[in-house]
């Protein structure tokens, strides 16, 4: 956002910037910030043991090597408990930070989080393989509100919608539902590392350069 840009531009030389969340947004922000402000200390907090842990290790290594070469510190296995002015708590331990940028993802709206149904630890609705709420089979949950193994995205919601359409079609025709729904496969994504490098994961293939 514009406010974040202004706050970063006003930071003095040697300031510490903590980026919480090492998904695509965090990765791209860290790389762009490094190229625009070489005088800052940048820390990228990742909840997992490696960047983009749900994708091939080749992709993780490529990104990690770029960060290592450009002096961006990746902090794995991070759990940010609390953020205070000038301080961040990672796994209960305080660290001095001049600016925190939160890219750790989104959560469902409050009305969804307060529904009297089973939720994941991230506040998303637990659904069955047909994308239904188990206790309310006439209710389907799609997109950011659904608890799925993939990161929320428009692409994922569209794939869910296609499966739900098939489920509804069978129900309207009084046909039995399949014992096992096909696994949802996200087609891929693109990411950048600064102005001149990038990466892609398309149809189970990793492309870097």
Where do the protein language model's features map onto the residues?
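Short glycine-/acidic-enriched loop or helix-start segments at secondary-structure transitions
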Residues: 29-30, 54, 111-113, 151-152, ...
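C-terminal, flexible cofactor-proximal segment of oxidoreductases
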Residues: 160-209
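FAD-site-proximal beta/loop scaffold in flavoenzymes
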Residues: 1-13, 87, 94-162, 166
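Cofactor-binding loop segments of dinucleotide-utilizing enzymes, especially the Rossmann-like FAD-
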Residues: 22, 47, 144, 195
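Residues at the starts of beta-strands that form the adenosine-phosphate
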Residues: 16, 39-43, 138
């Amino acid at each position: 956002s514009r406010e974040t840009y202004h706050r970063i531009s006003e930071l003095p030389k040697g300031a510490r910037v903590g980026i919480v969340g090492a998904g695509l947004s965090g990765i791209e922000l860290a790389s762009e910030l490094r190229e625009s402000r070489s005088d800052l200390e940048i820390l990228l907090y990742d909840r997992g043991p490696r960047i983009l842990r749900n994708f091939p290790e080749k992709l993780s290594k490529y990104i990690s090597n770029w960060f290592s070469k450009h002096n961006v510190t990746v902090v794995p296995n991070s759990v940010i408990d609390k953020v205070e002015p000038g301080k961040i708590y990672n796994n209960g331990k305080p660290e001095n930070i001049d600016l925190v940028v939160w890219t750790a993802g989104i959560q469902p709206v409050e009305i969804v989080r307060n529904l009297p149904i089973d939720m994941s630890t991230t506040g998303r609705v637990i659904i069955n393989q047909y994308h239904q709420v188990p206790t309310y089979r006439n209710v389907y949950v799609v997109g950011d509100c659904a608890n799925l193994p993939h990161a929320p995205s428009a692409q994922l919601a569209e794939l869910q919608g296609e499966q739900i359409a098939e489920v509804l079609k069978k129900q309207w025709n009084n046909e039995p539902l399949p014992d096992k729904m096909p696994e949802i496969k996200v087609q891929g994504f693109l990411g950048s590392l600064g102005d001149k490098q990038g990466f892609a994961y398309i149809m189970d293939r990793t492309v870097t350069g």
